[in-house]
């Protein structure tokens, strides 16, 4: 996608390239600050103009919200954007063109860290409607959408909590089932894991996709 859009980009090869941050889940804010410092220091050494975060909600929040504050920074030393924002820019600037739209009906899951936390509901929908011909909204949606069952790092607590997550979030299973679609667009890694667990446990016959999956599948190459 980066190459097709003609972006000038790089991927670090040293520590600091990955923003997965278990410290945010465990409450180890001192270590979280160290991880963020390494990330931004590496970005500054590379002299990049901004950091594009992948489709991961917790990593994004640990950068744009919590890591900065625990380091005592008012703003990030290097601007940070989520993949939703970046894809939106590429599409609106005409840098990504698609050969056709995705025809099967899809629904949109709103990740908490990008929609409630960052306010990206409109841009998320702009991107999905550009890519997909038939979008069916969940009810409720946007900032009122139901949790994926993986939030706050609970999915990483493993098997002992899985049955609680599955049975305790039947409301999400019902919400998904009521859309009548088979494809869920979820731009967050944790949400993918949580939704896939719900889909399998409740036998919903659905599958999940990242926005990047759809763009690569549909774009001119």
Locate predicted features.
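Iron-sulfur cluster-binding electron-transfer modules in prokaryotic oxidoreductases
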Residues: 1-221
């Amino acid at each position: 996608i980066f190459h097709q859009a003609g972006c000038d980009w790089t991927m670090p090869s040293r520590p600091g390239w990955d923003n997965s941050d278990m410290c945010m889940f465990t409450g180890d804010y001192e270590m979280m600050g160290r991880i963020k410092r390494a990330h931004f220091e590496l970005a500054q050494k590379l002299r990049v103009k901004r950091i594009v975060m992948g489709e991961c909600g917790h990593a994004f929040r640990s950068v744009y919200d919590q890591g900065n504050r625990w380091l005592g920074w008012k703003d990030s030393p290097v601007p940070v954007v989520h993949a939703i924002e970046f894809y939106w820019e590429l599409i609106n600037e005409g840098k990504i063109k698609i050969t056709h739209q995705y025809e099967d009906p899809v629904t949109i899951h709103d990740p908490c860290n990008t929609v409630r936390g960052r306010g990206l509901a409109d841009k998320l929908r702009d991107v999905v409607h550009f890519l997909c011909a038939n979008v069916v909204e969940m009810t409720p949606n946007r900032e009122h959408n139901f949790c994926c069952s993986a939030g706050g790092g609970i999915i990483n607590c493993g098997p002992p909590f899985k049955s609680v997550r599955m049975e305790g979030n039947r409301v999400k299973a019902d919400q998904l089932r009521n859309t009548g679609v088979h494809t869920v667009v979820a731009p967050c890694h944790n949400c993918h894991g949580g939704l896939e667990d719900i889909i399998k446990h409740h036998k919903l016959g659905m599958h999940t996709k990242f926005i990047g999956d759809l763009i690569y599948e549909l774009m001119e190459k």
